[in-house]
Amino acid sequence: MAGRVQLPRLLLLVMLFFPPHLWPQRSRAAKPDSDTITELVRRVVANYKSREAQLDNYTYLAHVARTEFDGNGKPKGKITGTDEIMILEGTPYGRTVLLNGRPLSPEQERQQQMLLEAEASARRAGYNNHPVHNFFLAPIVQLPDEFRLRWRSRQLLRGHEVQIIEALPIDEQRPASSDQEYARHFKMTLWIDADEAQIVRVESEVISSVTLDQNLFEVSPDVKFSGVHTWRFEYARGTTTAMEWTKVNDEAWLPKWSSWKTPKETVTALTPTKPAVPIHSPEQLTATYSDYKKFRVDTHVVPK
């Protein structure tokens, strides 16, 4: 009898703290409908595009580690380096300050200074094609229109609630632009801070092989000048990329870390001075970013 008396009291307490008119709202909050998801993704992509230029307003350190694997997937070599990203003649420039955890040798320091001076001269002459930012494969801009979006769950990430959304390419047999065709090679998972309407993390995976032409920084053998050459990269199915961002100074969303891993990579040089030789090398590239400082001083190199 005591149990029968307590049950109505328990139900009364439930009704008091969780009244029925709140039940539908709680249900909807637990799993947004497809229109709500699409609108949220459209907003965060717009914010993502607008925030990309913010990185050029900061100096920072980029800590990079490159690991190669053998045919059995075991690591066979690792190289690490730290670059100081500064503002040189008005635009970002990366200067290596550590190699494999150690300061540069006097000769390496001399080479870095020569490269900086050569780059400064080139920029003063109007040439500026020095890639600094980490290349990120994920087709984020195409998310609202070229992917089927599925809400998965909520979780806490660094103390903030984020919504996890899965993005699968739309499977349609129709003519496609180059951007649409590119998007069809990926599936992605998003971590979204809905309160800020910002993408906090993205993980992507290549689901069908994709080939890209990319500009890469190169140095002349005598270290007299730097330049950019076009290489062709084939990213195999199973290649994964990820990036996470954090809010800096309560004003800018900037990269916190990034990673890239491929089971197989085919690289073909397209420069006229090098043969087109494929290179197969499974590898992983990880980077963390730290010491962000709002740009204050531009570096100028006085010509000798």
Predicted features, each with a name:
Residues 25-187, 194-201, 205-241, 246-304:
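Structured extracytoplasmic
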